């Protein structure tokens, strides 16, 4: 870690005498071995060979399954496996992935996500044709726990190529899911790893904004990555306590320094408004499930993001519903 950014792990360059492939596909895992087979299969189906691609699973000391057995069964000697000596948390596990990578291009692929045919070929084309870019990402699809596709990410532009004015777009909201993006290793070497100040959300978005502030970014219009959503995400502790939005507010404050001074205030307000509405959306879903505690916390975080009438009115309306529901619940008990 540097003195300037003590919360970001330094990513040292690869030793000069190390053989380097083009790709490092680094797969962080934690208690997701039931999905890891699908993840590995999607990568191995596009494997150009060990001289071109490093494939390695980095496990954060899983307690509920055996990812090493899956690697040995499906990948044999082709896929490397490394396990932390103790659970270190997802951000430090990401750091380990970056530090153990040898390739010129790094793809962090969560152990429950997948890539579609053509992912590595198409994104490598972006780097080959545009030596100045720091990262490339593609449109992505969301899938559920059973692998069924649910919806597709927004189309950022009509044709593949370098994105224009990308910093002012990515700073407004999270537009990239991790399995869809590839980053030059030298970019991580220059900018450092993921910021450790986040507890559950925001570390990836902050990184993508950081990269956009320093490098051009290339975009592939074909949806070649699959991001898995879990039904448990809404009931997770980070959402019920509001920590997810707390992390987002922290990220918004951090990325402000990457913005042009004359535009920083306006863009920051737009971002805060977006995530205030996002929190109210969570609050509404939690309220519908009868989770008053979680709904109240999301309403609170929404108002901490933005206290304009656009946020206050729906927050007040939802709070009133929760209040009357509590009264009715008490009446029913008598």
Region roles according to the model:
Residues 59-69, 86, 110:
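A conserved acidic beta->alpha catalytic loop
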């Amino acid at each position: 870690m540097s003195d300037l950014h003590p919360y970001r792990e330094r990513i040292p360059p690869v030793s000069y005498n190390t053989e380097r492939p083009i790709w490092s596909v680094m797969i962080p895992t934690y208690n997701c071995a039931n999905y890891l087979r699908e993840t590995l299969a999607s990568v191995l189906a596009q494997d150009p060979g060990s001289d071109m691609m490093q494939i390695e699973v980095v496990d954060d000391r899983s307690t509920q399954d055996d990812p090493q057995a899956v690697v040995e069964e499906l990948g044999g000697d082709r896929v490397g496996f490394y396990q932390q000596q103790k659970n270190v948390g997802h951000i430090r596990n990401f750091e380990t992935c970056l530090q153990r990578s040898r390739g010129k291009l790094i793809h962090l692929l969560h152990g429950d996500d997948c890539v579609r045919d053509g992912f590595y070929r198409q994104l490598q084309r972006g780097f080959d044709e545009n030596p100045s870019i720091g990262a490339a990402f593609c449109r992505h699809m969301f899938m559920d726990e059973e692998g069924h596709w649910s919806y597709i990410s927004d189309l950022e532009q009509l044709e593949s190529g370098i994105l224009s004015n990308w910093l002012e777009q990515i700073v407004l909201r999270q537009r990239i899911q991790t399995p869809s993006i590839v980053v030059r290793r030298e970019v991580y070497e220059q900018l450092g790893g993921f910021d450790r100040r986040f507890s559950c959300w925001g570390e990836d978005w902050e990184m993508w904004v950081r990269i956009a502030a320093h490098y051009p970014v290339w975009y592939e219009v074909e949806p070649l990555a699959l991001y898995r959503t879990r039904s448990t995400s809404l009931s997770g502790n980070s959402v019920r306590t509001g920590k997810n939005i707390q992390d987002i507010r922290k990220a918004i404050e951090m990325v402000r320094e990457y913005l042009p001074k004359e535009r920083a205030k306006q863009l920051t307000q737009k971002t805060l408004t977006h995530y205030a509405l996002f929190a109210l959306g969570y609050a509404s879903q939690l309220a519908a499930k009868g989770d008053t505690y979680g709904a109240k916390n999301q309403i609170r975080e929404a108002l901490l993001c933005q206290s304009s009438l656009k946020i206050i009115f729906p927050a007040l309306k939802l709070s009133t519903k929760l209040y009357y529901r509590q009264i009715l619940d008490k009446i029913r008990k008598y």
